[in-house]
């Protein structure tokens, strides 16, 4: 097929896009702005804004007109209040980050061989393994993004610890920037994974014995 990315320049571009996608996806894992909660003042809970992340939640509350306090709580594996989409995203995003790291490692090895014009089976296999790992990383990221996006759209609640003084559901819930960053990182991971997976050794890379003239 004509869209196979077999040239060195094309594969180096693929590697650059893969790196961008991996960085965006890995960065989103540490961001806290996955779900934004806006909470009004009630008799049970004080007003404030909460950023619900995959590994922690940060709560911002205005004490005076010029003072805002911030409190962050990092989830532990003993926390049973975490909903399915967050528990799943914790595992999926970490797995995707590891897969993406090793996918880049195999891609670098294949590019090294290509730059040295070593078009052998090891080069082909490295591109294929890199493609599989990058696609798997992209799929894991995509599932985590879609699950948490769906939770925001459907206004799903979370039963936080009483000490956090947060309601089960906020008055307003919005999609945070972390979901957008993770979503942007999915596309290059999937596309570059496809290009690497279907890499074909160019005909000129095949080694033929030379014929000496008498």
Swiss-Prot record:
GO MF annotation list: structural molecule activity
Topological category with respect to the lipid bilayer: Multi-pass membrane protein
Transmembrane parts of this sequence: 12-32, 81-101, 126-146, 178-198
Any single GO CC term annotated in Swiss-Prot or TrEMBL for this entry: plasma membrane
Keyword Protein biosynthesis among UniProt keywords: no
Alphabetical UniProt keywords: Cell junction, Cell membrane, Membrane, Tight junction, Transmembrane, Transmembrane helix
Segments in the Cytoplasmic topological domain: 1-11, 102-125, 199-214
Family matches, as Gene3D superfamilies: 1.20.140.150
Residue intervals on the Extracellular side: 33-80, 147-177
Keyword Zinc-finger: no
Main localisation: other
Domain of life: Eukaryota
InterPro entries assigned: Claudin (IPR006187)
Location of the protein in the cell: Cell junction, Tight junction; Cell membrane
GO-annotated biological processes: bicellular tight junction assembly; cell adhesion
Purpose: Plays a major role in tight junction-specific obliteration of the intercellular space, through calcium-independent cell-adhesion activity.
Quaternary structure, from the entry: Can form homo- and heteropolymers with other CLDN.
Family statement drawn from the similarity comment of this UniProt entry: Belongs to the claudin family.
Protein name, entry field: Claudin-34
Organism: Homo sapiens
Gene: CLDN34
């Amino acid at each position: 097929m004509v869209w196979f990315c077999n040239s060195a320049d094309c594969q180096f571009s693929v590697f650059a896009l893969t790196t961008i996608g991996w960085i965006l996806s890995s960065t989103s894992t540490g961001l806290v702005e996955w779900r934004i909660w806006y909470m009004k003042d009630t008799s049970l809970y004080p007003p404030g804004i909460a950023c619900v992340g995959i590994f922690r939640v940060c709560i911002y509350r205005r004490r005076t007109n010029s003072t805002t306090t911030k409190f962050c709580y990092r989830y532990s594996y003993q926390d049973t209040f975490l909903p399915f989409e967050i528990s799943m995203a914790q595992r999926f995003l970490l797995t995707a980050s590891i897969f993406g790291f090793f996918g880049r490692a195999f891609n670098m090895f294949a590019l090294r061989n290509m730059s040295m014009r070593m078009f052998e089976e090891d080069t082909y296999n490295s591109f294929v393994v890199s493609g599989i790992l990058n696609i798997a990383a992209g799929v894991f990221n995509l599932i985590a993004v879609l699950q948490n996006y769906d939770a925001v759209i459907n206004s799903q609640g979370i039963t936080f610890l009483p000490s956090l003084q947060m309601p089960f559901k906020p008055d307003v819930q919005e999609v945070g920037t972390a979901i957008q960053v993770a979503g942007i990182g999915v596309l290059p991971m999937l596309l570059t994974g496809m290009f690497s997976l279907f890499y074909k050794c160019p005909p000129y890379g095949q080694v033929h014995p030379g014929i000496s003239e008498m």
